[in-house]
């Protein structure tokens, strides 16, 4: 019986699952919207929401705690400095999941997970900067 067992297995090992959630959290913090399967999005939501709730404090202990989870310094900086201040007055519910149909190959349910008050320009900034460097 699965009484009081939280989370989904996603048919992968626990270390793979933790690494996948950390990588997806970095991608979500960087781009503020990502497309993934619906079960992965549902697993990512509580993971990222606890990180944002911690980041609202913005002290050294929180910085180290968040860095131990996601292991990317630029994502931690953005999480604490930008997202922590953006959601300072919001008591929770920082993300939304939007269902986006089914994947063509295997009919897996696809969803977008995004921040509620996201910066629309955040998704394209990295590609625009890369294109400018190539032209120069």
Swiss-Prot record:
Part of the 50S ribosomal subunit. Contacts protein L32. One of its GO terms (molecular function) is structural constituent of ribosome. GO terms for cellular component: cytosolic large ribosomal subunit. Pfam families: Ribosomal_L17 (PF01196). GO terms for biological process: translation. InterPro entries: Ribosomal_bL17, Ribosomal_bL17_CS, Ribosomal_bL17_sf. This is Large ribosomal subunit protein bL17. Keywords: Ribonucleoprotein, Ribosomal protein. It comes from Rickettsia conorii (strain ATCC VR-613 / Malish 7). Belongs to the bacterial ribosomal protein bL17 family. PANTHER family: LARGE RIBOSOMAL SUBUNIT PROTEIN BL17M (PTHR14413:SF16), RIBOSOMAL PROTEIN L17 (PTHR14413).
């Amino acid at each position: 019986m699965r009484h009081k067992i939280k989370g989904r297995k996603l048919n992968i090992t626990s270390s793979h699952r933790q690494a996948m959630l950390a990588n997806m959290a970095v991608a979500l913090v960087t781009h503020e919207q990502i497309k993934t399967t619906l079960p992965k999005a549902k697993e990512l939501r509580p993971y990222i929401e606890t990180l944002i709730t911690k980041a609202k404090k913005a002290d050294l202990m929180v910085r180290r705690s968040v860095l131990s989870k996601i292991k990317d310094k630029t994502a931690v900086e953005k999480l604490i400095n930008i997202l922590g201040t953006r959601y300072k007055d919001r008591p929770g519910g920082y993300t939304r999941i939007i269902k986006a149909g089914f994947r063509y190959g295997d009919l897996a349910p696809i969803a977008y997970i995004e921040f509620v008050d996201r910066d629309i320009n955040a998704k394209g900034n990295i590609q625009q900067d890369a294109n400018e460097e190539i032209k120069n």
